[in-house]
Amino acid sequence: MAAPINQPSTTTQITQTGQTTTTTTVGSLGEHSVTTTGSGAAAQTSQTVTLIADHEMQEIASQDGSAVSFSAEHSFSTLPPETGSVGATAQSAQSAGLFSLSGRTQRRDSEISSSSDGSSISRTSSNASSGETSRAESSPDLGDLDSLSGSERAEGAEGPEGPGGLPESTIPHYDPTDKASILNFLKNPAVQQKMQTKGGHFVYVDEARSSFIFVRNGDWSTAESIKVSNAKTKENITKPADLEMCIAKFCVGYETIHSDWTGRVKPTMEERSGATGNYNHLMLSMKFKTAVVYGPWNAKESSSGYTPSAWRRGAKVETGPIWDDVGGLKGINWKTTPAPDFSFINETPGGGAHSTSHTGPGTPVGATVVPNVNVNLGGIKVDLGGINLGGITTNVTTEEGGGTNITSTKSTSTDDKVSITSTGSQSTIEEDTIQFDDPGQGEDDNAIPGTNTPPPPGPPPNLSSSRLLTISNASLNQVLQNVRQHLNTAYDSNGNSVSDLNQDLGQVVKNSENGVNFPTVILPKTTGDTDPSGQATGGVTEGGGHIRNIIQRNTQSTGQSEGATPTPQPTIAKIVTSLRKANVSSSSVLPQPQVATTITPQARTASTSTTSIGTGTESTSTTSTGTGTGSVSTQSTGVGTPTTTTRSTGTSATTTTSSASTQTPQAPLPSGTRHVATISLVRNAAGRSIVLQQGGRSQSFPIPPSGTGTQNMGAQLWAAASQVASTLGQVVNQAATAGSQPSSRRSSPTSPRRK
């Protein structure tokens, strides 16, 4: 027997401390390792430690009590041999676990045994005489199996019970040691029904005997019975699930093992040893995930209660991916050699076709001539309006000695009329026309044959959903909020509708869907609500009065006649009305000179401011109220007044805006407290509005958008704001001059304001 080509994995380390020499050997096998330590002479200790380590590793490998043995149970003789040691060999195979692995010479004398957590495979060959060997080499009688093939059935698919139809439930007996008996057993339809496949091989699982019949790659001549047993106890596998798992792993790894053994392992061993070794065992150890081929088992390895070594006495071979789950066995879809579903026989011989005198040259008497079949599938037409199938023609020509030509035509017209005509040399048969009516839904189709009935109307088109259902939930919620705000303005507390709104509900929904929301406000009247006498008629509370003077054009503050009637511009009138309807209170006029500053609108945020400057003042106070962010730069002229830049903050970013200042002529002004009143026009995503700020009070007035959405009112609004600011400055200056008199109510800047 040749030496193994894989040696144990051991590591030896020798250390010397003073006069003491310590030898340590570490051996590994899979996930297991053994460490042996000895002291003494280096050479002797090393040899002793190595032997002990090898023995321990072998003991570890022999502790695999769940290994399974596969052993072949048949001889290669077509008839049971009467001489030789076949019986003893077969009995030994059942207990020891052998299976054929390598290629055949005269007889497949190579053997495999597989030992693992689940499997050990073995097969033995017959030691019959040369005469029996020649009989074994003869081709077995496969019979119907020669044309039988199959493929793996899809998971969950229902296949035929067997190629022979519904089989009988009785399973016949077979001799596992006789190949002829196995082949006859496999010919039974009941057996074929129960056969399965894995890895391209066919298997029949005999759970009662803990064995299976293995047909390699569907080649029925390789059929053999394999016994499955525990490699340690040599007992049968009693659990069907475990038995199926072992068989499936064997089928998946068989071709890889066989190829590696015949192409690499065996030639290498023979080259190194110079002799042909009897390495006829294969052990599959799932515990260590290794496959090893080695020589015959000795008495200890063949005995019960001992698992053969998985590494020391053999050579490792590749197995492929069999160590993980490979799945179970699958069903088989059987296929046989296709046979014609119909046949054509000439029943009207012509000219003594069956007589010897009229037999054609080269045609034996009584010979059967295979018909030549032509099938034309062209011209198939389908009309959805009704049944309209084109003709299908089959021409069959049988030439028998040159005596007879027979043509059979089957045609299907658009009216479903079937005409079959058979023409021979002696007779013609015509069959009646068969009319088929196509029934409708609950009533007969009375349409005239041959006419094209218009197709029924199709289903109605799918109705598209409303636009609200096509927008996101966030947008829908915003639309509903905007609608709620509109309805709160459009109806008063009593549920009555309010007229003169800047937009209707449809416009609110449309703008909201586009991401824009304009507040709904009540439009002001077309004329200003002023009093000819110059007195406040309501809406503005009594107070300081300079805002009221601007709104009402008070003649007492401006020095005009008491009966003068103001003539405001239309845009001013709208602003005045909005202020009065908003019930803006006025503040007391301060006795001080004022300078009005107009800021030109730029980009999205601009403001119009009024700034008061005192003599010798070196600071400027500018207030801009809006929702945008930008730089507002103003410059005031006074004694020692520098340029001051301020910044207004809001919720959206805008570009930097510049301002142009319009100031009153410089003149000596009485010193006093400075005060600022600001009117700003603001544009943002919500719309436009006018913001009025006086001191610490501020009021915003939304500007309703135009009815059509196309008219640009920006120029008019800015002109109105500028006019208000200019007038405000003049009125404040005049009020300050008049307030310097001792008898005036507004003589003191510290006078308390009336609320």
Swiss-Prot record:
Compositional bias annotation for Pro residues: 452-462
Low complexity bias (residue ranges): 10-25, 35-44, 112-130, 139-151, 393-412, 600-666, 740-755
Biased composition (Polar residues): 590-599
UniProt feature, compositional bias: Acidic residues: 429-446
Source organism superkingdom: Bacteria
Stretches the record annotates as Disordered: 1-44, 72-91, 99-174, 393-467, 523-545, 584-672, 734-755
Biased composition (Gly residues): 536-545
Family assignment from sequence similarity: Belongs to the chlamydial CPn_0572/CT_456/TC_0741 family.
Protein name, UniProt field: Uncharacterized protein CPn_0572/CP_0177/CPj0572/CpB0594
Organism, as annotated: Chlamydia pneumoniae (Chlamydophila pneumoniae)
Species lineage: Bacteria, Pseudomonadati, Chlamydiota, Chlamydiia, Chlamydiales
